[in-house]
Amino acid sequence: MPKMKSNRGAAKRFKRTGSGKFKHRQAFLNHILTKKTTKRKRHLRHTLVTSGSDQAALRRMLPYG
C-alpha cells in the first residue's frame, strides 16, 4: 500500500505536540497592524491548541504528524 499524503496546507500551519494535540499560530498578525492595539498584538503572539472538534480532521490530514 502506498504512503498516505499529508495535506500540505495543514502541514505548514499545524504541529503535533507530544501528547498528540495540535498547536497553531494565531491569525491577524501579518499586516495592517497599525490600527491594532499593542495589547491585542501581544495576545496574538501566543500559540493555541486546536479545539477537540478539529482533532479528528487534523489527524486525517496529517497522518505522520
UniProtKB/Swiss-Prot annotation:
PROSITE patterns: RIBOSOMAL_L35. Keywords: Ribonucleoprotein, Ribosomal protein. GO terms for molecular function: structural constituent of ribosome. Pfam families: Ribosomal_L35p. One of its GO terms (cellular component) is cytosolic large ribosomal subunit. Residues 1-23 are annotated as: Disordered. One of its GO terms (biological process) is translation. Residues 10-23 have a biased composition (Basic residues). Belongs to the bacterial ribosomal protein bL35 family. PANTHER family: 54S RIBOSOMAL PROTEIN BL35M, LARGE RIBOSOMAL SUBUNIT PROTEIN BL35M. NCBIfam families: rpmI_bact. This is Large ribosomal subunit protein bL35. It comes from Acidithiobacillus ferrooxidans (strain ATCC 23270 / DSM 14882 / CIP 104768 / NCIMB 8455) (Ferrobacillus ferrooxidans (strain ATCC 23270)).
